[in-house]
Every structure is written in structure tokens, then in C-alpha cells.
């Protein structure tokens, strides 16, 4: 549905910190978004995490979920930027390695003023690798 260039029109993240390659589904009415990240050995973080045993840092998986959510809720929010406010109930189930494709599935639980609460899961080959609940605020740039 959205490619990388279209994603970059909606959120401020750029390489090497853009952690979603494509938005597959975006349901504004039901406040749900599904995104994808193709993980390659060329990712900057693999230089140090871990040499000879590359594993994607879990916090970056959570960040990828949040970026997908940002694409959904930042639609029409010119001059605004989403900031993390809290992360809760984070669980990492399995490592993510080069060659994996992560599917992020994120749903808004509540929006109040400029505060967004959501939950998401990350899957590789339909197996859950991570889950989290998070809060962020939408603020002026």
C-alpha cells in the first residue's frame, strides 16, 4: 500500500533509523496498520550486535512497530512529530536475524488529545518474535 518514499513523507525517520520498508495495510477506521521490514546483513546495527552472531536489537523491533503506528496516526498532521512517551509489557520471544522479514501488526487502543496508546506484535514467518504496548505523544516540531 505504501512504499518507503511514501512512508518517509509521513514520518521523520531516515536511514539508518527507518525501520519499516513497506506498509501492507492501513485501516484508518479501525486504527490498525500492518508493515514490513526486510532485515539484511547490511543493517548498521549488525556491526556491533553481535559480530559473528548477528541479532537485531529488540528495542529496534519495538521502534519498527512504533514507526508503523506513526505512519497511521500522522496522516494529515503537518508540522507535528510523534515522540515515544512509554513502553510497557515488552516481550521478546525469538531472535531476528539477517534474511528475516518482520511483519509488524499494530493497533491503536486509545487516542486522547495528542496522546496515543497502542499495542503491537512482530512476526517472522508467522511466528511471534516480539510484542509491546506503547504510548507516544504527537507534538509540534
Language-model regions, residue ranges each:
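Beta-strand-rich interaction surfaces with strong enrichment in secreted/lumenal proteins
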Residues: 8, 52, 92-94
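Catalytic strand-loop segment that frames the active site of acyl-thioester-processing enzymes
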Residues: 15-56
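Hydrophobic core residues within well-ordered beta-strands of beta-rich domains
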Residues: 17-19, 102, 116
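Hydrophobic beta-strand-centered segment that forms part of the acyl-chain substrate-binding groove
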Residues: 1, 68-103, 129, 133-137
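Conserved positions in beta-strands of structured domains
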Residues: 21-24, 88, 93, 107-109, ...
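HotDog/MaoC-like acyl-thioester-processing domains
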Residues: 30-32, 96-100, 107-141
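Short aromatic-glycine motifs in intrinsically disordered, low-complexity regions
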Residues: 1-14
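Active-site helix/loop of acyl-thioester processing domains in fatty-acid/polyketide metabolism
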Residues: 23, 56-79
Amino acid at each position: 500500500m505504501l512504499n518507503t518514499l511514501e512512508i518517509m513523507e509521513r514520518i521523520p525517520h531516515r536511514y539508518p533509523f527507518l525501520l519499516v520498508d513497506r506498509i501492507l495495510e492501513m485501516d484508518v477506521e479501525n486504527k490498525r496498520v500492518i508493515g514490513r521490514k526486510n532485515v539484511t546483513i547490511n543493517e548498521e546495527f549488525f556491526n556491533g550486535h553481535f559480530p559473528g552472531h548477528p541479532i537485531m536489537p529488540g528495542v529496534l523491533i519495538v521502534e519498527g512497530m512504533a514507526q508503523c503506528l506513526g505512519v497511521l496516526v500522522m496522516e494529515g498532521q503537518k508540522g507535528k512529530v510523534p515522540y515515544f512517551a512509554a513502553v510497557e509489557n515488552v516481550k521478546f520471544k525469538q531472535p531476528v536475524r539477517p534474511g528475516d522479514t518482520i511483519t509488524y501488526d499494530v493497533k491503536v487502543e486509545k487516542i486522547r488529545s495528542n496522546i496515543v496508546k497502542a499495542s503491537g506484535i512482530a512476526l517472522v514467518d508467522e511466528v511471534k518474535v516480539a510484542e509491546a504496548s506503547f504510548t507516544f505523544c504527537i507534538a509540534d516540531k
